[in-house]
Structures are given as C-alpha cells and as structure tokens.
Amino acid sequence: GLERYDPETRPMVEGEDYRVMTPRELRGLRNSRGICIGTARANPGRQITRPEHLTNPERNASLARTHQALAALGVDALISIGGDGTLMTANTLNRYQDMLPEGAHRVRIIHVPKTIDNDYSGIDFTFGFFTAVDVMSKELLNLRADAIATQSYFVVEVMGRMAGWLGYGVSIAGEAHMMVGVEDVVGELVDESAGSRDGIIPVYLDLDALCDRVIQLIQTRQAKGKTY
C-alpha cells in the first residue's frame, strides 16, 4: 500500500493499508506463533542500484511515495524486520532521507535482523536461525528413522540463500551423512560449461559430479553393512 500512495487518489486507509494496534492486542504476543502484522515482498528501493539514483525521480518514485505515505501518517520511527533484502530497503530509505532538503519529514529507522539464513556480517547469529535449525533437524531425525527402517536414502533440501549456515546446522543436529552447501561448490563440483553473463562468471553446481559423490557415499556405507 505504501508504494501506491497518492495524497489525492490513493490515500492511506486504516484497516487496509495500516493497522493501529492496542496494548491488549500486543499482550502475550511475544510467545505466539506466526506473524500478526503479515509479511510483504515489496521493495520500494529496487530501482536504486547506484547513489545517483537516489535523486533520480524516475528511479526513486516508489521510494518517494513510501516516504510520503509514512509522513502522511505521522510515522516518526520505522522498525524493519527481515533478512538481507529488507535490510537493503531500510538502508536505501535512510539514504534517501539524507538527500531531502532541510526541514523535510524524517523517519528514524531501526532494522531487526530476523532471518533463518544467518547470512549477516557483523553479528554472530540472527534470531530465527536456531529455531529453524531445531524444527528442521527434528524432521531430519524422523527421516533418518525411516531410512533405517526401510533401508533407504533421502535427499533433503533446505533454505539458506547465499550461505550454508542453515544447511550445516540442520545436518549436524539432524545427523545427516552428507551435506553440500553453497560454499562447497568448488573444484570438481563446479559446472565449467556455464559460461559468463555480462562479464561475470557464475558458479553453478555440476549435478553429475554431485551424483558421483552421492554414489560414492552409498558404496562406502554399503561396504560397512549400512544400506541406508
């Protein structure tokens, strides 16, 4: 709703674009499941890729409308909650405000690093990471029990975006026998035929090489009498 704000044709509507929460609604919220305020994939700063874009009307239009909407509501502080993308948006909005003339409405911005990926630099852990490891490792242990009972193998994929923290945390706690994270895609696991894009050589996983490694693991375990 904030990105579509227009003071004349698209003002902010309570109950549709924003919600005023009372102390009663907040009571006991800390230990409840889910996200009472919902989630969003909006990114008003997606067109800002260079510093000069902050003052470009075509590039900063969405960001400007978001700032104007917050100002219209009298919001003086914003707490952003999320991962890397949310952090970038919060930072872009803060930098945009630095470009505003003196006396313009300013919103103080605080970012809370909540992501299961644990891929932030500068801090040891993000909250949400350990919860995700705990929940997913229990599922992995259930699969391990099934694998032993049925003499089977399971392949499990977890999230993690650009880092293997979550995968390794789940693998260790869930007693997996093999783990491949993004940091492990080196050497023989790299698909050399991928080529380059815009002068950048992306790193892709070679699935054939990965299959060879999985087969090697299976054969090694079978030699030890473990067919799971």
What name fits each language-model region?
Residues G1-L2, R41-A42, G83-D84, V107, ...:
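Short, ordered loop/turn segments at secondary-structure junctions
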Residues G34-I37, I109-H111, V155, M179:
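Conserved beta-strand scaffold positions in the cores of enzyme catalytic domains, especially
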Residues E3-R10, D119-G128:
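Active-site-proximal loop->helix
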Residues G45-T49, N118-Y120, L189-D191:
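Short acidic/His/Gly/Ser-rich catalytic and metal-binding motifs that mark active-site loops
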Residues L2, G45, N60-A64, G83-T92, ...:
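Short glycine/serine/threonine-rich phosphate/pyrophosphate-binding segments
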Residues G1-L73:
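Glycine-rich nucleotide/cofactor/substrate-binding loop typically near the N-terminus or early
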Residues Q68-L73, A77-G82, M88-T92, Y96-L100, ...:
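Accessory alpha-helical/coil subdomains and C-terminal extensions
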